[in-house]
């Protein structure tokens, strides 16, 4: 059965508070599966399985699938619809409260697939990356504007701290755009399926990741300010900061949105050296 048929079969009522929008376009499901490149060696962690339409396809292709679902009304539906699969584990929990490192212990070739309410997208991505979770890739449906921020380049308005965070840890690839007409109920925004492939090493080597991300966040907190003014929040004396900019070869009058990840790395290392 397709998504609409399962929803009607169980007379499922959508929970607006959970931001539920279920994918009904089968071509999008196929593109997610193809883009995620799932095979029989993979353990898949699915966040937000809905009524299990995509989950079935994952179960057919993967070694095992762990699906995380918050809505208690969906649990019996998923249990019934997927009862024939012995490689399926259903976790009834808020994904924001999951210990992903524990869940991933002793598992090889972990790939994540997610179709999340958009309000939790950035927190989930940030946690998976900053907590050093051991996964190969994350294929996720997200709001178009967030995908554009993740996939942005310097010198554009979408480029910001989220861009740097994701691209520090991952290669990014947009798989396809998704119209609101592909969902029930119909959301008010366009969506994009994007894949994040985890790098074996961060894109740049830095002396302190904590300082690196502090510099990045400070540089974007007030986008129209120069780096010199933005980085005053680090509370470093004027002479030391002048020295750091000079050693990094970066003009302090530039704005954060003009710096590449490599330049952020160079600047943070030079600041680290003078602390």
Curated annotation (Swiss-Prot):
Q: Which residues form the signal peptide?
A: none
Protein localization: Cytoplasm
EC identifiers of the protein: 2.1.1.182
Where does the source fall among the domains of life? Bacteria
Matching entries from PROSITE patterns are given as:
RRNA_A_DIMETH (PS01131), SAM_RNA_A_N6_MT (PS51689)
Which residues does the annotation say bind S-adenosyl-L-methionine? 21, 23, 48, 69, 94, 115
Q: Which Pfam families match?
A: RrnaAD
The record's InterPro entries line, in alphabetical order, gives: KsgA/Erm, rRNA_Ade_diMease-like_C, rRNA_Ade_Mease_Trfase_CS, rRNA_Ade_methylase_Trfase_N, rRNA_adenine_dimethylase, SAM-dependent_MTases_sf
**First-tier enzyme category under EC:** transferase
Cellular component aspect of the GO annotation: cytosol
* The keyword DNA-binding is annotated on this UniProt entry: no
Q: Name one GO molecular function term.
A: 16S rRNA (adenine(1518)-N(6)/adenine(1519)-N(6))-dimethyltransferase activity
Q: Per the record, what are the reactions this protein catalyses?
A: adenosine(1518)/adenosine(1519) in 16S rRNA + 4 S-adenosyl-L-methionine = N(6)-dimethyladenosine(1518)/N(6)-dimethyladenosine(1519) in 16S rRNA + 4 S-adenosyl-L-homocysteine + 4 H(+)
Keywords noted in UniProt: Cytoplasm, Methyltransferase, RNA-binding, rRNA processing, S-adenosyl-L-methionine, Transferase
What does the UniProt function comment say about this protein? Answer: Specifically dimethylates two adjacent adenosines (A1518 and A1519) in the loop of a conserved hairpin near the 3'-end of 16S rRNA in the 30S particle. May play a critical role in biogenesis of 30S subunits.
Family named by the database record: Belongs to the class I-like SAM-binding methyltransferase superfamily. rRNA adenine N(6)-methyltransferase family. RsmA subfamily.
State the HAMAP family in the record: 16SrRNA_methyltr_A
Please state what the protein is called: Ribosomal RNA small subunit methyltransferase A
The gene behind this protein is rsmA
């Amino acid at each position: 059965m397709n998504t609409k048929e399962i929803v009607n079969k169980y007379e499922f009522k959508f929970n607006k508070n959970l931001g539920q929008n279920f994918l009904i376009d089968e071509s999008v499901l196929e593109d997610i599966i193809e883009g995620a490149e799932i095979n029989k060696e993979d353990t898949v962690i699915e966040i937000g399985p809905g009524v299990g339409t995509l989950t079935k396809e994952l179960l057919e292709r993967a070694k095992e699938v762990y699906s995380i679902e918050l809505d208690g009304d969906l649990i019996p539906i998923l249990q019934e619809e997927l009862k024939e699969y012995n490689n399926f584990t259903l976790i009834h929990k808020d994904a924001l409260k999951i210990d992903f490192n524990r869940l991933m212990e002793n598992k090889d070739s972990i790939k994540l697939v997610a179709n999340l309410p958009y309000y939790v997208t950035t927190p989930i991505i940030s946690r998976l990356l900053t907590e050093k979770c051991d996964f190969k890739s994350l294929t996720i449906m997200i709001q178009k504007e967030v995908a554009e921020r993740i996939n942005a380049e310097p010198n554009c308005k979408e480029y910001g701290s989220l861009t740097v965070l994701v691209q520090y840890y991952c290669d990014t690839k947009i798989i396809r755009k998704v119209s609101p007409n592909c969902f029930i109920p119909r959301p008010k925004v366009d969506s994009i399926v994007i894949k994040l492939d985890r790098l074996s090493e961060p894109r740049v080597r830095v002396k302190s990741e904590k300082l690196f991300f502090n510099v990045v966040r400070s540089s974007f907190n007030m986008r129209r300010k120069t780096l010199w003014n933005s980085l005053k929040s680090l509370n470093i004396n004027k002479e030391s900061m002048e020295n750091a900019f000079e050693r990094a070869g970066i003009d302090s009058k530039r704005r954060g949105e003009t710096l590449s990840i490599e330049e952020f790395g160079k600047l943070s290392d030079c600041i680290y050296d003078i602390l």
